[in-house]
């Protein structure tokens, strides 16, 4: 510890666990010497939307209980909509494959979907009536998608206008997301 002019030895069994997303790059790559000192495990994005929805639903329920959020568990349809948005933007096309989309610079991982849902639940619980609605998740969605305020904002606006606006049951998501912008 240079600041204390001291040295501390790790106890037996000490491990460092680091995480990163494939699309998140720092200024410099890790050196090959450092990479050799890590066991690397790559977790792929879930193959199906149903699998991803199940992961998000399970974690959101678990975290909601741990955080003692008084909000109702989110309707599966709200989770499905967030997962659909993330998958379509990640994949660069709509779920039906009919519309090609630009992808934002962020990863839009299941972990981010979990974060969007938990944030929405907290807003619904503490500032709403406890029922998760599109306006509760809109700011989280926008924050997850728009990492680069120039490039990603264009991607998100195009997605809203060409995909979300046209979906019959998604008018509330469209309105809420437009209000946040």
PLM features: what roles do these ranges have?
Residues 11, 15, 19, 36-37, ...:
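Generic alpha-helix detector with strongest preference for long hydrophobic helices that associate
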Residues 37, 55, 59, 81, ...:
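Residues that form generic nucleotide/phosphate-binding pockets
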Residues 1-67, 121-123:
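Canonical AAA+ ATPase core
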Residues 6, 24, 50, 91, ...:
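Acidic-enriched, low-complexity/disordered segments with a strong bias for Aspartate over Glutamate
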Residues 125-181:
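C-terminal engagement/docking regions of AAA+ P-loop ATPases
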Residues 53, 60-136:
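Conserved AAA+ ATPase small/helical "lid" subdomain
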Residues 24-27, 35, 39, 87-90, ...:
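Signal for well-folded cores of large energy- and translation-related assemblies
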């Amino acid at each position: 510890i240079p600041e204390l002019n001291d040295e501390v030895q790790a106890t037996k069994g000490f491990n460092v666990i680091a995480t990163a997303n494939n699309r998140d790059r720092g200024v410099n790559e890790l050196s090959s010497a450092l990479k050799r000192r890590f066991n690397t495990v790559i977790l792929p994005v879930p193959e199906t939307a149903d699998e991803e929805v199940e992961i998000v639903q399970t974690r959101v329920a678990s975290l909601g209980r741990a955080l003692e959020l008084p909000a109702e568990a989110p309707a599966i349809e709200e989770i499905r909509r967030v997962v659909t948005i993330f998958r379509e933007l990640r994949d660069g096309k709509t779920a039906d494959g009919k519309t090609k989309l630009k992808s934002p610079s962020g990863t839009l991982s299941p972990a981010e979907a979990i974060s969007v849902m938990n944030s929405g639940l907290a807003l619904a619980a503490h500032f709403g009536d406890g029922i998760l609605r599109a306006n509760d998740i809109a700011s989280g969605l926008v924050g997850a998608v728009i990492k680069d305020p120039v490039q990603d904002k264009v991607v998100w606006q195009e997605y809203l206008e060409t995909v979300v606006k046209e979906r019959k049951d998604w008018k509330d998501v469209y309105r809420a997301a437009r209000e946040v912008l």
